[in-house]
Amino acid sequence: MKVGSLVRYIRDPDMFGVIKEREKFQFITRNYILWNDGYPRIAARLWFDDCELELLSDV
């Protein structure tokens, strides 16, 4: 996985995002709530380990 890849959180298949930073963890800034409903206050910035993410589209 690299910056710009589209990923999905394995434990919650409805939650997906774009990798914005490449470090030990992947930084997800948007999820399905923000993209579909437009409520940025609900879309928290979260950190995930690589093993918790499924790669949907690689750049």
Which residue ranges define each predicted feature?
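Basic/aromatic-rich interaction segments and small domains that mediate binding to polyanionic partners
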Residues: 2-57
